[in-house]
């Protein structure tokens, strides 16, 4: 394993926090974005982890707020000629792979993902070459180049079902890049999985000691956990699942107070789903200067109103997502396998 990229020791180029806007500035950019979306025949596709004001704007303009799987479905099926993807770069790449005829814009092309950064394609190719007998399954949180090497792409919402299916066929798996999700899936399915050792900086910061203290303070609360979290956090959960699955769990659990261990961006849609329940952030490893993400992805936070307006107004190379056509065609194969498999689960 010494030749593998080590995400635990990597120093990620964290972006600066966006400059806060005044109330008047927010109103100005909101109206400008609404006008530009109409003029550009564009629609917004926003992830649950973007800031609440971005999700609200996507709702108001007929766009989509969802996890990465539904973002992929929505963008491919929507008649708009331009997709404004509010998320991180791999989401924009995925939109372009599935909709090559459309213009894909992002507020910034520098919105990274620690899972993507932690799985460089050269190192990953060497890892796969060393294990040619294994089926390669990669999480959606990867670059187009890594997807192009894969047999399957998967999201957390269907990970257990897909690996269970492959295991039933007797296939041995390479799983990348999230080690925590890989271990969770392995434990649920019993499959033979060899994990790449990546991690999400947000979920990796949840720690049992701090969560136990919060649980003791609110003993009547249920704990909801995303499986990108460490195993010890998952073991404390009343419900484990993807973003959309956690929102569904919030509605079905009888508890009136919920401790949520995932990016706090999810609170916007979760609170809509359970307006009468109290939502509490699961504590991260540190506070202030000692935590890296503080339960909110710093790259998701780059999707601000001003940046969205500029992307729609200026377009061009600073905002438009491009994927090499040969790479796109290769990455499309495992993505379509994922979408086809997901369709069978929906019946």
Curated annotation (Swiss-Prot):
Protein's cellular compartments: Cytoplasm
Sample GO molecular function, one term: 4 iron, 4 sulfur cluster binding
Cofactor binding description: Binds 1 [4Fe-4S] cluster per subunit.
Binding site for iminosuccinate: 47, 68, 139-141, 156, 226-228, 243
Record's GO cellular component terms: cytosol
Top enzyme class: transferase
Function of the protein: Catalyzes the condensation of iminoaspartate with dihydroxyacetone phosphate to form quinolinate.
Protein name: Quinolinate synthase
Gene name linked to the record: nadA
